[in-house]
Amino acid sequence: MRCRERWTEMERSSGILMPIFSLPSPYGVGTFGAAAYEFADFLHAAGQRYWQLLPLGPTGCGDSPYQSFSAHAGNPYFIDPDLLIREGLLTAEEAAASAWGENPRHVDYGKIYENRFALLARAKARGWERDRAAISDFETENGGWLPDYALFMALKQHFDMKPWTQWPDEGAQRHEALSLSHWRAELREDVELFTYIQFLFFRQWDALKKYINGLGISVIGDIPVYVAMDSADVWAEP
């Protein structure tokens, strides 16, 4: 009886499933930019109360949102270049110079992978020192996963994106402290880049989510059922 009473007290409402990557964008894949805010406005105008998303994590080699390099990190592809231009981290010419794919109905993940990280590296070159205090706070708040994730991605990049079980350095494979200390120093620039990318991701996502919630719309998230074998989570907890 109590359960029935609780159900009758719930307000009937509806929403729409719209993955971030499906939003229109001049950058090859949907982002947290203008189209996301416009979709939130559309939901509000249509009387919808929920925006359902697919997982927001960084996709692995199969580009599936359900196979992610991290259960905690965000997908770098969703960082909007136009917002970075507005912050002074990129120029419009830099954002327009890269090829993002020619078919607006299909995501060319190959081109995005080739070009997105180079663009974000430009943003990091301008913003790392400028944002240092905020980055330090971000690192402290996310200390349980961010250091391992940033080093994991730097190592994957260094070892040609091979699964961590195939890395030629056995110490790095086994997450041994001495090896990790060596690689953290050796790959410092890349570790900083992957740290800064997460800083940018969550800054843009937090702003978008605040806007969505301000319209009276709730976000229904999603996560993979299991962590992926080739992920920072499994690597860091062997």
Segments (PLM) and residue ranges:
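Short, Lys/Arg-enriched N-terminal segments with co-localized hydrophobic residues
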Residues: 1-9
